[in-house]
Amino acid sequence: MRKKQFTLGFLLFLLLQKIIFAEAYDWEKYNITKEQYLLLNEIVESLESNHLIKKEYIDIKDEVSKLYLERLDPNKTIFLSRELVGFEKEIRKSNEIDHGLQQAFLIFKKYRERYLERYNFQLNFLNEVVKKDLQTNKLLLRDRSNANRLDSIPELKTLWKELIINDLIQLRLSNNSLEESRDKIIKRIDNQLNYFNQTDSEDVFDIYVNSLSSIYGPHTAYMSPKNTEDFDINMRLSLEGIGALLTSDGLYTSISSLIAGGPAEKTGNLKPSSPS
């Protein structure tokens, strides 16, 4: 008996340690790095000095923050109207570039908390939903990009619930049983959560800096190392998919040969050793 108690206690200890480490890791991965502070200042300096459109950070910082918030929560299902007022108030406290980045990260952490709250609320509702819940006749605005933000948490929860009910009804109309519909939506929100949990400091930085750069024009953008790698991979796959074999010298990628009869050879637009 004592051995079983010890084993159970040890397993609970390990589980608690995993939870503590998981929470610490989740918090740590959303911290700003020194390199990001330096990089942002370099980007701002470069934009102010070299861009054809002359704009100073101090003049556009409120616009940058507004765009950042729109990109985080475009459908207005996360933040309340009063929360945006609070965010804007904090942002206006300083014109320092570092302060703007700090506020962006604090806002994202709040976003993450509310995102998890929404996930848990919708999951609990899905586990308890019955057919009677679907017997409703309401007009639901799916695209809320031009709607006003809600004023309270109860209003948000009502919206979260109505969005799930709408999805359930749509699936039921496609001849899915209630159980099948529930399982499909749970799988979808689980996948969304898994994808969301892969975000880190680099992603938050990317959203903020691109909110900044896009103020200078639609063709001004920042590509993080992660996005650059994804772009290179997609470009490589695209070229290989049309029958072009690539080689790299570590700095440049070039076309070494074309597969006979492949789309690239047939069009005649690409030649070996052409820069990719």
PLM region spans:
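Generic signature of intrinsically disordered, low-complexity, basic-rich segments
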Residues: 3, 18-20
